[in-house]
Amino acid sequence: MRTRPAPGTLTVGPVALPDSPVLPAAIAGVAGILFVVLRLLVVARGDPSRFVVAGTTFTDPATAPHGLHIFPNNGYDGQFFYRLGLAPVRMAHTAFGIRLDTTYRLQRIGYPALAWLFTGGQHRMLPDVLIILNVVGLAVLAWLGAVLAQDCGRHALWGLVFAGYFGAVLSLSRDLAEIVAALMTAGAWMVVAIYHVAVL
């Protein structure tokens, strides 16, 4: 691990902000929670399955899991991550009443596989876990970004740049995989940059 400059503080007016990865992680985590709670109460009407944004074009209301809200339209990509989260090893084009729009979806298995792991295969928990994974992922992404920023001699708050990209709002609101994908990329980058792991 490289030697970096001694930690310091960033002063904003009369407030001194510590140079710690915990600060951007906490800011990103709280922002993610507030956004999800507001969306859940205002837009989703208290129903976390609305974050999936399943639509009748690809999701059959007659055979889809009980309790999944299905919109009368195409839906959005979250319905495919939800479907893969129900059974990641089930590679059929149609399962649980949800038809994949393309087999390309099967390659994006990380986020739904993690969700399946944390639900223990309990389908009713999946909408909640998909949301929780993205909120936690946002906080961890900010933490990893802060560690990388510190390694480059910057204040830890620069970690918010990693968590603050515009797509995070869409990922949080529609159960998309970008936050988890960015988290895995930043984690790999940290291992390579800080610990000098050789890359082929």
Q: PLM ranges: what are they?
A:
Residues 173-180:
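Short acidic/glycine- and proline-prone juxtamembrane loop motifs at membrane-interface regions
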Residues 125-129, 145-165, 182, 195-198:
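Transmembrane-helix signature of polytopic, membrane-embedded enzymes
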Residues 188-196:
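Structural signal for the C-terminal ends of transmembrane alpha-helices
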Residues 113-120, 129-152:
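Transmembrane-helix motifs of polytopic, lipid-linked glycan transferases
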Residues 75-123:
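Short hydrophobic/aromatic helix or loop-helix immediately within or flanking a transmembrane segment
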Residues 95-101, 128-132, 163-166:
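Short linear capping/connector segments at secondary-structure termini
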